[in-house]
């Protein structure tokens, strides 16, 4: 499943990078926004189908009754967190394609090291929560990153072109973004 969503992220970053590099910054921003909405919706749909069909699907692997229950609930947990995770992943890839490699990477590593890993460890080792509760803590940094990165995506500050045409279009793009911000305020 991860390879499929990685492919969507790569395709999104290519589309965004091509537009930003060509100086079509508004179109690059539009593609990134669309990808950050459509790809998580695809993730949600696929995981929902898998959750609904978990019995026939996972019975192919000869899992016992207890394992089947766990896979069902793990899919339900991932139904929510997977969509959020895909959104964050897509945003990060689009940031990189738009010339911003630092913000998404720092948020990803920082979220894991300072939020998810400690929270998961505390949930499992200190609080002795059941496995499924501990499993859900693995994805907690995704919520934090979603809340921080989504406004960053929408503001377009991550667009930092590396090419001549992209750089030439940057000042006008920033002016348009400021005007949009003033109209929205």
Spans of features found by a protein language model:
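Residue-level recognition of transmembrane alpha-helices
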Residues: 39, 75-78, 82, 108-109, ...
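Intrinsic disorder in cytosolic terminal tails and internal cytosolic loops
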Residues: 159-185
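Small-residue-rich hydrophobic transmembrane alpha-helices
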Residues: 1-54, 86-107
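Alpha-helical transmembrane segments of multipass membrane proteins
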Residues: 2, 42, 46, 50, ...
